[in-house]
Amino acid sequence: MTIQDRAHLYNNSDFGQQFPDSRFMVSDRWISATWITGNNYKSLSSRSEDDKPFYGSYPPGWLKRMWTMFPDAKRILHLFSGSLSAADAKPPHAHEFALRLDIRAELKPDIVCDAENFAASVKAYAPFDLMPSDPPYSVEDAEHYSTALCNKRKVLDQCHQTLRKGGLLLWMDQSIPMYSKKHWKWVGSISMYRSTNHRIRGVMFFEKV
């Protein structure tokens, strides 16, 4: 399935029909869209003890929209999964597994591991079809998580080792990570807006070459 096919899946989905301004623009080179998810202060990853949003978690509705584009994804790895629950990590379609990886054991991910060196820890599950990834964007963000800011070049190298050829890395960030054109093809982007006083995030679609 091409990236253009995936854009058309979203455009023809309930989300694309209900929110026509969110549909992808499609060209031979890539796809692009703007998504405004609205004023919902409860993020998908939330602390069960007090129901307050977990700092930096996925924007509301992000995964539900994203799943419409990947009905064929069987092996999924959520990098920097935070407090994403096992139930929310799973797509609505038939799949083999949807694993959560995070360095913080207290958040109870499926795999406790440093994202800069995770390839060996997921060897039994690789290669993956899809990797949604939401890393800390800055030193300040990393301090909120009580972790060090990751080396994004090293993380992308680990992703390249464990994705199948043609597999997709969905990298959510406030800047474009350094990447090698020998290893990755940048095939799409989404500009993500929530509401006032929320940061703007981008989602970069990188296809493994």
Regions found by a protein language model. Name each.
Residues D129-L149:
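A short SAM/SAH-binding and catalytic strip from SAM-dependent methyltransferases
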Residues G166-Q174:
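Conserved beta-strand signature within the Rossmann-like core of class I S-adenosyl-L-methionine
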Residues S146-K165:
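A short glycine-rich, Lys/Arg-flanked "PGG" loop and its adjoining helix->strand segment in the class I
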Residues Q174-V209:
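Class I S-adenosyl-L-methionine
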Residues M1-H93, H198-I200:
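S-adenosyl-L-methionine
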Residues S81-N117:
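Class I SAM-dependent methyltransferase SAM/SAH-binding core
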Residues A94-E96, L163-G167:
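A short helix->loop->beta-strand "cap" motif at the edges of active sites that frequently abuts
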Residues C113-S133:
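A short acidic, Gly/Pro-enriched loop at the edge of an enzyme's catalytic core
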